[in-house]
């Protein structure tokens, strides 16, 4: 990976003897060397691979935004910027019951001609190591793959298009932890692009296009499969869905209307590009549902062939059960 590191620093958030969250500040920024470059490169890679990211933008009165602008202009040293940010993060984090301890990593860097600011509170875990004398001793390590209190600012996008609603991205975190809430409060930012909604609008547009084009059942299944495969490939590549690019891979309607023109003419409010949501696009090729002790998933092409639904009685009939399920059912009789 081509990465140019400008600044990186670590501070520690921990609880004192009174169970109060405090900040242990590092005395100075880390040196830019192979170790720190490798650390930031790994943080960048893992963040890109994380699913379920949210997007946002600064509020007009964001104090953090003012600090960031001063830091970028050179009137506020990066070290002081990191101290102010660490204190602000501690104050926000202390309001929540989970109040995680960890190592705060702040890094200003460039990757693929794009400037970024990374801010993340990483778990500090213990493991074992073998010394040169073949003894066993404890060692601390940063659990980068488990990080979920993280945000990244696309500085290039922010500085060239302040009207953008997505230059700030963050990991939403585990359900119930409200990670997104406090991190947005810390940055004094609002939720911007709603990726879940964009994916749902895309799915509806696909349904409507197929209906408007009067596709046969087999054509609808094939069309949805192509959309799913494109979206899934984008997810695997860490790339975004580009509506015009997607349209170029899909067949037009019998009247010659392509998918991109259809979404524009019908007023679907789709961004030019957005991250694909795995759970949403999966529904293009599968029926999925859970509740009341049931968890069902089957290929959409089976509906009407091996799986039948009666809406009047709300009954689902399956003809031909999977062998492993059939074996379990017959053994319990």
UniProtKB/Swiss-Prot annotation:
Keywords: Cytoplasm
One Gene Ontology MF term: double-stranded DNA binding
GO cellular component: bacterial nucleoid; cytoplasm
Protein location: Cytoplasm, Nucleoid
Superkingdom assignment: Bacteria
Record's keyword annotation contains Cytoplasm: yes
HAMAP family for the chain: NdpA
Protein family according to the UniProt entry: Belongs to the YejK family.
UniProt xrefs under NCBIfam families: PRK00378.1
Protein name in the entry: Nucleoid-associated protein VC_2039
